[in-house]
Amino acid sequence: MGATMTIPRMAFAIGILAALGLSQAASAQEATSWNLYDSYTTSYTINYTKNSSLDPSGAALYVMASVAGGTPVEYQLDTGSQGMVLPQYLLPDFQQSSDLQKIEYGSSGNYALGTWTTQTVTFTDSNDGNGNLATAEVEVFVAAEYYDSANPGGVSCASADSGCAHMIGIGFGRPDTGWGPDYLPSLNNNPLLHLTGMDEGTVRAGYVITADGIQAGLTSANAGTGFAYVQLQPTTGATAPNWQTTAGSVVVNGTSSSSPILVDTGLQYMWADLGSSIAGQSVPCASNASFNCAPDGTQVSVYFGGTEGVGYSFVVGGTDNPPATPEFARLAGGGVNTGINVLASFTYVFDAVGGFVGYLANDPQGSGITFSPYLSAIGDFDMPSSFATNLPVYIAGDSVFSTPDNATFASAFTGIGGLTLDGPGGIIFQANMTLPAGITVSAGSATFQATVAAPLAVDAGASVSNLGTIVGNVTNAGTFANDGTVDGNFANTGVLSGNGTITGDLTTGGGVSPGHSVGMTSVQGNVAFQPGSYYVAELGAGGTSDLVQSGGQVFVDNATLYVAPTAEWKPGFASYQIISAAGGVVGNFDVVAPSFGAIDAPYPFLDVDTTADSDGLQLDIVRSGIAFASVTETANQTAAATALDSAAVGLNAQLVVLNAADARWAFDQLPGYVNASVKGLLVEQSGLIRGALDGRLRAAQGGVAASAAPVVGYALDGGADNLAAAPATTDGLAVWTTGFGSWGEMAGDDNAAGISGSTGGFLIGADTALGDSWRVGLAGGYSYTNFNLIDRNASGDSENWHLGIYGGRTWSGLPAGDIALRTGLAYTWQNVEANRSVAFSGYADQLAASYNAGTLQAFGELGWRLDTAVAALEPFANLAYVHLDDGGYTEDGGLAALSAPSSSMDTGFSTLGLRVSRKATLAALDATLRGEIGWRYAFGDITPMATQTFVGSDAFTVAGVPIAQNAAVLQAGLDVKLGQATTLGVAYAGQFGDGVTQNGFNANLKIEF
């Protein structure tokens, strides 16, 4: 029995109904449903017998059933009791226990003595749509004796005419008074809840009672749409599953009382326990003078579920009453029993699994009927997966909603109880909610899309998304995304995000992170960052940033500001307003910016600074104390980085936004060390000219491993006929020509990338004898060199014009063999074109330099010829000096362009080696095999250098690829005399050492005419 409700509470309940939109209009029940039963498709139709009636004077419902395959008989259905009772005569061979049990009917006081036994119950006039009968394996009560008002001494149930009860109790929640001693009322002994498939879970245990029959097994078709549902509470302390009687209220002549409401098909009248509220207003009942009844004219209303949304009203003795009106209204104890007649106006659902009863008005607009679909919740509601409903919800008492994954409520919430959302999944509320007792999100997530009039608490680990308006104070210890309005104060120890508004004050001991990435949190009152709290200010695209906007003051007390750039942020020097406060900012943040100002940070060369003023707090991106050179790994990178740090203009804006790795890559491209490496390449390629001049001298001297190709001889008398082919060793004036070429690369080191190059060209010369032993000559020519920096976007070429003089002599007839001296001096004019590209994050440039260079070289060689029976040998020693001058350059291009003054390079080469040649016959042709092996040593300037400047920077020096200090020199050649006037010569020259490879090849065909 509940306490009598006061008028203010009833007024509140009426207001709740208005908020829910509950009315008697037929439109209120259209398309209202839930998907609780969508996964079930099977139900059993159980027909009533012809003796069934809902007439007030003799209402009762009967079905045909057999037990243990016996004769089917008629049983009365009773929602006011539990358990199936059959007389002993239906199981004549059944042996009763010596310890009889008792089952009593509380409304009438009738009872039976007998024994419980498990039997097969078959409803013989039933069908599941596939021809199957409704069958249950369940405990039934076999009555040996029956006691009622007509037989107070009891009768034996051994014969069919004994008058013993044939009853199937399908109710729940009746008190256990009169039962025992070993059995209590339980859902376990209800045959309608244990039909085939129900215990296995494939059929939803429950039933629908209509005026035409019973649907056993709940589906979306018979119970999913149009009903008002009231949640039941489990029976406390029960040893077997059961539900408590439905909560409700009754109003008599304007006086309301909350009370359990029992829909009892075993009773033809109504009773109500009103205590003293109608004292002096009761009269003897017309049909039974021993009962007290409400007198004619008494106004009675019965409501299910704690609201006035579902119920019926009648006037005792009235003429315009609904079909639900009972034969008479008895005034007695024990709550409210509607009797069977309520089923004349309502279809009734019992869900034994979920713990719900449902009501569907047969004529919602009929006289005295109040009906609008809704869900009245109280206690624990464990929703199935993907639960969804558009039923309005009334929270009749403190409730806990749980969902395994997600749930959606499309209609309004009201009620007097508190609502706890216990996850672990997420629940979406799409309509208004009015819950003065408050909402607690203890786990999982909740999304509010409309107006929520309730204080709200969010526990740690839970999350809330507010897309509407919350009218009430919020306490958040979890994650709260406010993209609507909180009309109240907000106390935060969790994390607050979103782009919403708080009309009151924001007090935070947790985190504030406006927006969803970059956004604004607006607070109309004051903002207080308490000790231990933090503000995550994100920087976004287009100069945007997070903003906390306050209509009052912002107080900061030992709080931390975390600065976090987003992926869309374009780094650079800029200012951002991160707090706007009408009353200014009091206090300072400890600033933490892990993305800035450290070598391993994404932006090592940038840092943050804050400035508070009367308008708020400004965040500035400034240059950090990390020098560019702090991230470099090579000398060239360091040189360029140091120079760029010295420049107040130029590339700084592009470089300060880089991380360490990108900066190193930039500093590897920016130094322009291709300009240094080209110098080394040109010095290396000068050896081609020395080699050609030295080779002509050796040929003229008949030296070892010299080419045997003829030259053009010229007689001094000047006659035209005096021009003729002559052997290479001719004493007269000789005109000669040779082609040369090479390709190779100089491998890079940790400081500079390697360079590859190729050269092709020719020389034309003339020489003559001078005195008895000397021969001198003059030569000139042209060559073309191209080069590429390996794995770098740098390349170029050089056009080269050559002029040289050479001379030598031999000392023959010495006891130890012939000695030969060979010397020369040459100069090369070079026109160099160098192109490079620079590309790193946020910057690209194409650069070109064009400049002149000149190479002066001198060489001398001594050779000692030794003839043996096998071959001719010549040990030799060669010394060369190379001086390179370039005229300086200024690159065309952008901010990465370099300028350099003229510079020079002086390099010496010494070579010790051995040449060998041998005559041979190849396929009957005369041939000469020749070869050379030696060791070359470089000294002086072997690492080319370039001193350059960027615009506005200090000068810096970078190193190119070094010339190999030690290298092996190899040559091999073959001359074949193909005929009297034809000679074919081929030769290979190579140089290997210290990462340097150079290969040369030439071929010549000489035909004498």
Label each PLM-derived region with a short phrase:
Residues 400-405, 481, 485-577, 583, ...:
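Extracellular beta-strand/loop-rich repeat segments of large surface/secreted proteins
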Residues 654-868, 985-1009:
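Outer membrane beta-barrel translocator domains of Type V secretion systems
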Residues 22-28:
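Sec/Tat signal peptide C-region and signal peptidase I cleavage site
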Residues 809, 813, 856, 876, ...:
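Outer membrane beta-barrel transmembrane domains
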Residues 230-285, 523-524, 869-931:
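Aromatic-anchored, glycine/proline-accented short structural segments
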Residues 365-376, 387-479, 485-486, 490-491, ...:
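Extracellular repeat-rich scaffold modules on cell surfaces
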Residues 28-376:
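Pepsin/retropepsin-fold aspartyl endopeptidases
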Residues 6-14, 18, 367-384, 545, ...:
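Outer-membrane translocation/initiation segment of Type V secreted surface proteins
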